[in-house]
A protein has these predicted regions:
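Conserved short alpha-helical segments that host acidic/polar catalytic motifs at enzyme active sites
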Residues: 1-221, 229-264
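Glycine-rich phosphate-binding loops that contact phosphosugars or nucleotide phosphates
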Residues: 261-337
Length: 337
């Protein structure tokens, strides 16, 4: 339906655009709750991945101050706060470089950076935020906390996504954005800003990923494709990890043998198929190592008080390395000691 509605409007005269498919964590799956969410005056459009845990408190304060809301989302709370913060800052709130921008674009970008930094200080939870302004529609300003954000660097075009799969068919050059950093993106330049307000050098890397892996290759669904790819995937995984004596060599595991031998319990955490992989590993570890293994969904592990001792090994499994529930579960495990 979305494609039909967009196509019905004819060609869009725009250089930059944002969009996001959001799980209905706040509010029902309705058009009013869909992204992007707009500021009350229509100046700003914002998309958000993650969960703002203090959204209800912030919304109540805004309503008490005269604001009205059109949706049930935590995202709309953020864009309301951003519009207010934008009016409270000046271009002098950030004096560093801004993605090669000049004139009105530069002024708007500087104010958006200041506003974004002010808003993120009020938010509790995990988020990636992208915002555009109708005063400078060629610029996107983004921020992240405990939620992934990757920039794709193209030729005369740049991309923002939670994973390289969002843009790998267009470019294999990428920049990962750090915790609590703000980024200004135009079609030609990218500026990354640290939490203290200082610009930082881009940490560019090359994506070793073929866009063919993002297609169904003739299968009706990705699920069927991945099921039939499993034998080859297991073979490819083991191929470089078996030495000349036929023994498994896991050089990536940088844990001293003495520490591994002291482990008396293993907890494996993951989401979806990563959790299933943990179930398979449980059989192997308990059979050959005679060490008890627990397997738990990351989303459940992070909300309970697990028994994690000094000799407990917690293994996190994630296909992307960016599964938010799993990352939060790792932090929770570390807090247990």
């Amino acid at each position: 339906n979305l494609i039909e509605e967009v196509d019905a409007d004819g060609p869009i005269d725009a250089i930059a655009g944002i969009g996001h498919t959001r799980w209905a964590t706040h509010g029902r799956p309705t058009v009013a709750n869909a992204h992007p969410q707009m500021s009350p005056d229509g100046r700003f459009a914002l998309v958000h991945n993650g969960i703002i845990e203090n959204a209800d408190i912030l919304r109540a304060a805004l309503i008490a101050d005269g604001e009205a809301f059109a949706s049930e989302t935590d995202t709309e709370v953020v864009v309301h706060l951003l519009a207010r913060a934008y009016d409270d800052v000046t271009p002098a709130s950030y004096l560093g470089p801004v993605a090669g921008l000049t004139g009105a674009d530069e002024e708007v970008a500087r104010r958006l950076v200041g506003a974004m930094r002010a808003v993120t200080e009020q938010l509790h939870g995990t988020f990636t935020l992208l915002v555009v302004s109708n005063q400078s529609p060629n610029v996107i300003v983004a921020a992240r906390r405990s939620s992934p954000l990757v920039i794709g660097l193209g030729e005369g075009e740049n991309f923002l996504g939670s994973d390289v799969l969002a843009f790998v068919e267009h470019t294999n050059r990428a920049v990962e954005i750090g915790q609590d950093q703000v980024v200004v993106v135009s079609a030609t330049d990218v500026t990354v800003i640290d939490p203290d307000g200082s610009p930082v050098a881009l940490k560019e890397y090359e994506v070793d990923f073929s866009s063919d892996r993002a297609t169904k290759n003739g299968w009706p669904t990705f699920m069927e494709k991945e099921i039939h790819e499993q034998p080859d995937a297991v073979g490819a995984t083991l191929a470089d990890r078996i030495d000349s004596h036929g023994r498994l060599a896991l050089d990536e595991v940088r844990i001293p043998e003495s520490v591994l031998r002291s482990v008396d319990k293993v907890i494996m955490i993951g989401c979806g198929t990563a959790s299933y992989a943990g179930q398979v590993a449980r059989y192997a570890i308990e059979h050959w190592c005679r060490i008890p293994v627990e397997v738990e969904l990351s989303s459940e592990f992070r909300y309970r008080d697990p028994v994690v001792g000094e000799k407990t090994l917690v293994v996190a499994i994630s296909q992307s390395g960016e599964t938010m529930d799993t990352i939060q579960a790792i932090r929770h495990a570390r807090e247990q000691g």
